[in-house]
Amino acid sequence: MKATLCTWLPAAARKQKGFDYMNKKNAVLSPLAGGKLGKVKEIWSRNSLYSTLFALVVMVLIQAVVQGLNNGSFFGMFGGLGRAWMNILRNNVYAGIIALGMCFIIISGGIDLSVGSMLCALGGALMYLLDEKAGPLAAIGITGAPAYAISVVVIILMGCLMGALNGGLIAYGKLPPFIATLGTMKIFRSVTQQMTKTFNPEVPAGFKQIASFKIGGQVILPIIYWILIVALMYVIFKKTAFGRQTIAIGSNEKAAKLSGINVPAVKLKIYALGGIMTAIGAIIYISRIGSMDFANAGSGYEMDAIAAVVVGGTSMAGGKGNVFGAFIGMLIIGVMNNILNTIGVPTFLCEAVKGLIIIFAVLLQKKDSN
């Protein structure tokens, strides 16, 4: 059995069960451990966060060279660097917040393909609640800040329930995560499109200030929200029993169950947390943009989130990952998009590059499961 499967157990228990991961005699080496590829994989596996940071630095250097060759602004003007990074951060806030929830899901050994469609559905529901002409809150005389607060709470609860639906299908319905979330992805998108055929709400100007208010001439509130949520999710992952249980389930679900963890309940909470993160992304999206194309909004966010999590060092096999790594991974994806757009690469080829990055990252982290 892999030495790292039970690292969440006390040291004495690991030694008793023969899982002492500090004992090299018990270590299981991959058949591909030899050679240059094996060395790269070993370095990536043991220092995934440092590897991710190094990859970000390399991407930034490439970005600097590309933009410098393109218009000279990156090296010649400090403002060029600032503008480029502000755009990268702003453009990736929504998928970046979703990636934080996706990180927990993938560490637990699951996946959620429905988050893009979920964001679209939640965005539509939020716009309906906020509409001061035909919305339900305006109909009963609730407008302004009270309406904003109620709408935000309702959308977060809806996101929690939608995520819990995925978790329930997986944990209690025993459906594979891929199948369950593929089904809900189609359901969420289809229902939203059907319900918004004659939908033309207006987002109040006051609500737009939640994410569009300028500080120093720049729209940075969404970035601040993102960083604060990263810090919160990091604390939840590193300092709470819930975070340890997530790792335990992803490492070895049977062992986690035998140790007393209520696996179905924890899985339900994990997917509910993913739904909450998607709801927050939808709230910031509507506040920042003020409108939504219900046919395409959120499309591809699931792939961006998965790519960020995997590039950030989280194992697709579960049991290993880092919330901060998911944040860095999303920055890498954002810088890559900026580079490709700068050199004029078509959008469909950009998506192909993302796919190659996911495959390469998984190949680097892949190990023998025996």
Describe the function of each predicted region.
Residues 69-90, 192-193, 199, 217, ...:
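Inter-helical junctions in multi-pass inner-membrane proteins, predominant
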Residues 52-65, 102-103, 156-159, 185-190, ...:
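Hydrophobic core segments of alpha-helical transmembrane domains in multi-pass membrane transport
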Residues 63-67, 81-133, 169-174, 313-323, ...:
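Single transmembrane alpha-helix segments in multi-pass membrane proteins
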Residues 173, 177-239, 266-269, 288-299:
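Transmembrane helix-bundle core of multi-pass membrane transporters
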Residues 7, 12, 16-97, 135-148:
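Membrane-interfacial amphipathic/re-entrant helices at transmembrane-helix boundaries
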Residues 148-153, 162-166, 218-293:
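Helix-loop-helix "hairpin" substructures at the membrane interface of multi-pass membrane proteins
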Residues 278, 289, 293-355:
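Transmembrane alpha-helical segments in multi-pass inner-membrane proteins
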Residues 134-184, 328-329:
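Alpha-helical transmembrane segments within multi-pass membrane transporters and channels
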